[in-house]
């Protein structure tokens, strides 16, 4: 087994770009470990991390303002390569003696970039040749400020029509700045440029692979747990599923999984979870049927946030009750992943604005005196899926669309009732079945049905009936931060509507949600 597979590591300092997590994932895809820290992290932490290279992300601020973020000065004294992207390039230029100006003429979208001088970062990269016989790249720009004077010993490597210094470099120190975004797919040679920086200039060895991650994680789990007992809340989602299989591989029957059927799951989901994890993989599972308990707790509650809190509280109560029945349990396992920690600002890297309180991070029962095990906390979702494939989990489970923690509790608008959940489950299953038949399920990022607690008139035979309404939602997105409604074929939508109205008794109308994000969110509640 290869040890210390994260010994070659890239540190990314986050200045607030919407693409920063994507940047970290791009580096992981090369097989190199990367971490994402806030820009104002303490200098001692950076030194202790021992990065092989440092990347400064983009950001929404103007580098021309005096009170905007700056990189810790220590990064320019460590003797490691530094790559500044967009805002990261601008703050690098200012901090090293250059000038950045707001020209009131930004660049947004595609731009042809002409390579003026040879450099290790971009030599051999080319999308086309321009009329001046210069090799050019098609890049994605998103900036209003630009570097107008180079720091001492820097060279201009590339230009666009409105940005004379689009790439700058200090060849001896291996400091580089690019005004565009290499991490997005719109920059055609972006991944090649990042690979050049990480693998060649920083000389990182690609050891961060699914097989190596599994081997190292299993070894660490065995050392950490020994002969102790571990308890895990199994939801059937990707994160808890991979956590369960990893722990089962490491400690076998010392793992007890608690699976709570809250009555808010998708059609047949409870049985599918038991079939896979209990029958196929042989996990020790305590199955708690608690639909009535959840429905009683939700009675009369319409506010979405209150519903979320009630569902979370009841789950914790049930989990506590089951944990108390187990003898000798010393560890609580969770499927926390890296994005949970980043978004909850709970990784303790520096001051960071709290984006949201994630249920895995903020919802721990305070009275539980158990050690915490989070074997996936350094992994992004796509890495977790890769581990799942290596571990033998079904592809269909690993690539299911996201499902909210409160389940159908936030897809039934207003008060949650068993009747509403039953209707919604059937309608949702029909929608997903038809998407799969049309081979469109994996082409949309997320698709689901929503129950609207309003009665609409319909005609059934010779009579008029007032029955419920179902809304269908399908979106396309790269990062779930912004999304476009999926332009599904009309004939598909027609089939789905006809099936739901004919097969789900109590539904008389089906509508399709064509709202983007923003202004709408992906979920209705």
From Swiss-Prot:
The active site is at residues 86, 181, 183. Its EC number is 6.3.5.2. ATP binds at residues 235-241. Gene3D superfamilies: 3.30.300.10, 3.40.50.880, HUPs (3.40.50.620). Keywords: ATP-binding, Glutamine amidotransferase, GMP biosynthesis, Ligase, Nucleotide-binding, Purine biosynthesis. It catalyses: XMP + L-glutamine + ATP + H2O = GMP + L-glutamate + AMP + diphosphate + 2 H(+). Residues 9-207 form the Glutamine amidotransferase type-1 domain. PROSITE patterns: GATASE_TYPE_1 (PS51273), GMPS_ATP_PPASE (PS51553). One of its GO terms (molecular function) is ATP binding. GO terms for cellular component: cytosol. Transmembrane segments: none annotated. It holds the Pfam family GMP_synt_C. Residues 208-400 form the GMPS ATP-PPase domain. Pathway: Purine metabolism; GMP biosynthesis; GMP from XMP (L-Gln route): step 1/1. Homodimer. Catalyzes the synthesis of GMP from XMP. This is GMP synthase [glutamine-hydrolyzing]. It comes from Hamiltonella defensa subsp. Acyrthosiphon pisum (strain 5AT). The gene is guaA.
